[in-house]
Amino acid sequence: PKVQQNHNNYIISLANLCRWLAEQAEALGVEIFPGFPASEILYHEDGSVKGVATQDMGIDKEGNQKDSFEPGIELLGKVTVFAEGCRGHLGKQLIEKFNLSKDKDPQQYGIGFKEIWEIEDKNHEEGMVMHTAGWPLDNSTYGGSFMYHAENKQVFLGYVIGLDYKNPYLSPFDEFQRFKTHPAIRKIISGGKRISYGARALIEGGLQSLPKMFMPGALLVGCDAGTLNMPKIKGSHTAMKSGMIAAETIIENIRENKDLSIYEEKFRKSWVYKELHAARNVKPSFSWGLILGIIFTGIDQILFRGKLPFTLRHKHADHETLKPASEMKKIDYPKYDNV
């Protein structure tokens, strides 16, 4: 499908890109406070968002102030933009307080594992991208992998599993380890060295689960709202564009006193909305199982290019699909080979 074609794209390190962007922002006068998480939303008396307070630093596990104690500070603004990502706790507070998910489908989540490998030169093919679906998962579990051959003999390897799986014995981490034993993967990383690894949550609900993204005094951008394109397994580009639209909205709000609701109007007219609309039916179709999901996705994405005249729904939150252990078969995972 076109949604998974990466021709003429660049394979880069997102961490390096973010560091470079931080330098550009600071050169323009932006202040960045790494290591100081926002812990509390501040409100005006009328209930509109006033800003955030950062967390007190230098507190021991008993709650006592250490010598390194630094009190949190209040950061106030005419408009506060929340860009915390998929697990943003303040964003979720706002969604609940302002009922932003009214009439929306339950949000869907996944967990993704990623490793960076330095592999042997004979196994490296810079620019090569590979996606897989299914194995080692069963037919009823949503998931797939990615592999990007980057520069300097590095490979970015990862696996994403939807958290709507049914079997409580399923271990996402162990499924990823088993995935690496597949001959097609093993031959690439064999003789290599894992130099970095991590895991993070992904937001998978797409357009059907996207909440209202504005409220009095604040905006949601990126995966604090849920702009990830799940079939692409990419969300940085949509998050950045939503931030650009938010900036345009704030300028018009301050200069022309326009209502923040224009943010949603601008978002709906952007390529981000069109992209999410075209991808909207992919994730829910896999509730029918891997085989039917792949067949439907082929029809939806290749033949109709995401323009089918109907929208599939997410009928359940992820945790509601989990079945009792007594009804499911225990999964025996192979021991790690430590290779």
Please name every model-derived segment.
Residues 1-48, 53-64, 69-82, 86-92, ...:
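Conserved N-terminal/central alpha/beta ligand/cofactor-binding core
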Residues 97, 111-140, 204-206:
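Flavin-dependent oxidoreductases
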Residues 104, 167-170, 209-212, 230-238, ...:
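Alpha-helix capping and helix-loop boundary segments enriched in small/acidic/polar residues
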Residues 139-198, 237, 253-256, 260-264:
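Conserved FAD/dinucleotide-binding core of flavoprotein oxidoreductases
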Residues 187-209, 221, 326-339:
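A glycine-rich dinucleotide-binding beta-alpha-beta segment and adjacent secondary-structure elements
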Residues 199-230, 261:
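FAD-binding beta-loop-beta segment adjacent to the flavin cofactor pocket
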Residues 214, 220-224, 236-250:
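Extended, hydrophobic alpha-helical segments in both membrane/secreted and soluble proteins
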Residues 226-232, 244, 248-291:
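Active-site-proximal substrate-binding core of FAD-dependent oxidoreductases
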